[in-house]
Design a protein with these regions (language model features):
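Active-site residues of response regulator receiver
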Residues: 8, 52, 80
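Two-component/phosphorelay signaling modules centered on CheY-like receiver
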Residues: 11-29
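Acidic catalytic/metal-coordinating carboxylates
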Residues: 32-36, 59-63
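Conserved phosphotransfer cores of two-component systems
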Residues: 42-44, 67-74, 98
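Active-site beta3 strand of CheY-like receiver
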Residues: 44-50
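Receiver (REC) domain active-site loop signature in two-component systems and cognate sites
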Residues: 55
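Alpha4 helix (beta4-alpha4-beta5 surface) of REC/receiver domains from two-component response regulators
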Residues: 62, 83-104, 111, 115
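A short, hydrophobic beta-strand element within the central beta-sheet of small alpha/beta folds
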Residues: 73-86
Length: 123
């Protein structure tokens, strides 16, 4: 199964999806902000990165930009809990231009996320 780096400032999201992904057989590494997430990826590259867009310290757009610049083959899924659809769609459009493979709006359907993981990081 896949090794996944999950970056989100919301501990509840990390806990919930950590359990779901681990329950599906994936290894999950978690970070609470973009700086920590980038540092973890540099030390321990994973098969897939899931990052929130809006976070303190370093937001998801900066994380995506930096990781895709330094690791152009990285597979990234961007997620957002923004309730402002035009802003969320703008960030998703830009993230896709930067190389993000899939985007999800919170709340995320666990089955849809697991399906995307299977597509992006097959065994």
């Amino acid at each position: 199964m896949a090794r996944i780096l999950f970056i989100d400032d919301d501990q509840l999201t990390l806990d919930l999806f950590g359990q779901i992904l681990e329950g599906a057989g994936h290894e999950v590494i978690m970070a609470r902000d973009g700086v920590a997430g980038i540092a973890l990826y540099r030390k321990h590259p994973t098969d897939l990165i899931i990052t929130d867009i809006k976070m303190p310290v370093k937001d998801g757009m900066h994380v995506i930009n930096e990781l895709m610049r330094d690791f152009p083959d990285a597979k990234i899924i961007a997620i957002s809990g923004s309730d402002r659809e035009p802003r969320r769609e703008f960030f998703f459009d830009v993230s896709r231009i930067l190389g993000v493979k899939r985007t999800f709006h919170k709340p995320i359907d666990p089955e849809e996320l697991l399906r995307a993981i299977r597509e992006l990081a097959p065994d």
